C-alpha cells in the first residue's frame, strides 16, 4: 500500500493505478498482440501479484487483450466494462461485470463512472457478425482519494467530453485517426481542463508507422 495514488503506463492504452493499495489496470495489453511492437512490456501477466480490478473500454484487441486478461484471472478479483464486453469476458471464464454508460460502481475506495465513447468503426467494414452499438464502448472516470482520473477509451470527439467534472489526470489519446479524438478534439479537451496532467496514451508501442491509430 502507498499513502497516495501512483499511475504507471503499461504501453499502448494500458495503465496501472495503485491508489493507496487498491490496484487497477485499464486496458492492459501485456502479451499476445498480433502486430510487431516497439517496446518490451513493463511486466508479464504471469508476474502480476494482485489486482483488485481490470477495466476494459472496448473489444479491440489492443485494449481487450484476451491472453493478458485470462492469464491474470487467478490474481484479479473482477473485470468491468460495458454489457457487450461483459458477455465476451464471460465466455473466457472471467469474473466480469457489465455496466451502462453513466453508471457508477466502486472498487475499494475508488468510485468509477462509465463515460460515453463513439468508436463503432467495425460497422463500416463487411464481415462482422453483428452491428456494433455506441454503448458497446466506454471510458472511465475514476475518483480516487487523491484526485480524478479520466480514461476516455477510443472515441471520436464528443461534446460531452467538455462537460465532465475537471479531471486531475487524463489518459490522453491525440491520434489524428478518424475514429479517435483527433488533434483538434484533443486540443479542445486540453483547453477545457487546463489544470489536468496529460499522460500520453495509445502511442509508441505498435510498430505500424503507416497506421494513424497507433501513432500520435
Predicted features by range, described:
Residues 25-27, 50-62, 79-82, 150-153, ...:
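Active-site neighborhood of phospho(di)ester-bond hydrolases with catalytic His/Asp-centered motifs
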Residues 42-105, 113, 118-121:
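Active-site HxH/HxHxD metal-binding segment of metal-dependent hydrolases
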Residues 1-13:
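Bacterial Sec-exported substrate-binding components of ABC uptake systems
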Residues 22-32, 99-105, 109-120, 156-157, ...:
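Conserved catalytic scaffold of divalent metal-dependent phosphoesterases
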Residues 80, 84-87, 156-216:
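Cap/insert and terminal regions of metallo-dependent hydrolase folds
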Residues 10, 14-59, 66-71, 121-131, ...:
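Pre-active-site segment of Zn-dependent metallo-hydrolases
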Residues 2-5, 18-24, 104-113, 143-149:
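Beta-strand-turn-beta hairpins that frame and shape the catalytic cleft
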Residues 113-146, 160:
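Active-site-proximal loop/helix segment associated with metal-binding centers of metalloenzymes
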Amino acid at each position: 500500500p502507498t499513502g497516495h495514488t501512483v499511475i504507471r503506463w503499461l504501453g499502448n492504452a494500458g495503465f496501472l493505478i495503485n491508489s493507496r493499495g487498491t490496484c487497477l489496470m485499464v486496458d492492459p495489453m501485456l502479451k499476445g498482440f498480433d502486430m510487431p511492437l516497439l517496446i518490451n512490456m513493463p511486466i508479464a501477466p504471469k508476474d502480476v501479484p494482485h489486482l483488485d480490478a481490470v477495466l476494459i473500454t472496448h473489444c479491440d484487441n489492443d485494449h481487450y487483450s484476451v491472453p493478458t486478461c485470462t492469464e491474470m484471472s487467478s490474481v484479479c478479483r473482477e473485470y468491468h466494462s460495458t454489457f457487450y464486453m461483459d458477455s465476451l469476458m464471460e465466455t473466457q471464464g472471467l469474473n466480469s461485470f457489465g455496466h451502462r454508460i453513466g453508471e457508477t460502481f466502486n472498487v475499494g475506495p475508488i468510485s468509477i463512472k462509465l463515460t460515453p465513447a463513439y468508436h463503432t468503426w467495425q460497422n463500416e467494414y463487411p464481415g462482422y457478425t453483428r452491428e456494433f452499438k455506441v454503448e458497446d464502448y466506454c471510458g472511465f472516470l475514476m475518483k480516487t482519494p487523491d484526485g480524478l482520473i479520466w480514461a476516455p477509451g477510443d472515441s471520436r470527439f464528443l461534446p460531452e467530453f467538455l462537460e465532465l467534472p475537471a479531471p486531475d489526470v487524463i489518459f490522453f489519446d491525440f491520434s489524428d485517426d478518424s475514429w479517435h479524438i483527433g488533434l483538434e478534439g484533443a486540443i479542445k479537451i486540453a483547453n477545457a481542463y487546463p489544470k489536468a496532467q496529460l499522460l500520453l496514451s495509445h502511442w509508441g508501442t505498435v510498430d505500424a508507422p503507416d497506421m494513424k491509430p497507433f501513432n500520435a
